[in-house]
């Protein structure tokens, strides 16, 4: 097992969410999980609409790439906006039990879980273009940096583990709610 630059970056994300979740509160962390589901499903279902707009604006990229980019923009945009909206929308004590340490631990675990499935979501978004069809990782339809990001994520130790173990669970849980082209990633 080797730890590369991508693994260090993913580890920093996961540990950062552990710390933030510990101080943020259990109720907010549970809301963040719901926001992840909403962001992922919204991105999966709205990607074609935004993708057709991007295809008109970015004629140099393929339609499949524009759909993937639209999925990513919606997913990442909502996922980044969610903590701000949750923080502004919640007031007062965020405890769910009478034991502060239990609340802090539950919040940290939920935050780490959201970070892991958030990384998994990015892998799924990229896989909708790079993992399907012939010429996987062929950058003819998109810029090189997205292909490199996908290759680095799935070949890293942490990203590969998420890809192998977490993504099938996401596919099993959310599969019936996803469009068929996104479900193909889990096949």
Residue ranges and their predicted role:
Residues 1-187:
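Alpha-helical transmembrane segments and their juxtamembrane interface "caps"
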């Amino acid at each position: 097992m080797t730890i590369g630059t991508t693994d260090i970056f993913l580890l920093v994300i996961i540990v950062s969410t552990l710390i933030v979740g510990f101080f943020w509160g259990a109720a907010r962390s549970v809301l963040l999980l719901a926001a992840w589901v909403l962001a992922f499903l919204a991105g999966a279902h709205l990607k074609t609409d935004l993708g057709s707009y991007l295809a008109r604006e970015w004629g140099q990229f393929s339609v499949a790439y524009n759909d993937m980019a639209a999925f990513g923009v919606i997913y990442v945009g909502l996922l980044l906006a969610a903590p701000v909206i949750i923080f502004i929308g919640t007031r007062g004590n965020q405890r769910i039990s009478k034991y502060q340490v239990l609340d802090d631990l539950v919040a940290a675990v939920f935050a780490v879980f959201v970070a892991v499935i958030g990384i998994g979501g990015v892998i799924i978004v990229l896989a909708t273009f790079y993992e399907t069809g012939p010429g996987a990782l062929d950058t003819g339809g998109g810029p090189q940096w997205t292909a490199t990001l996908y290759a680095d994520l799935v070949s890293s130790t942490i990203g590969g583990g998420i890809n192998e173990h977490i993504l099938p669970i996401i596919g099993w849980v959310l599969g019936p709610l996803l469009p068929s082209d996104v479900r193909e990633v889990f096949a």
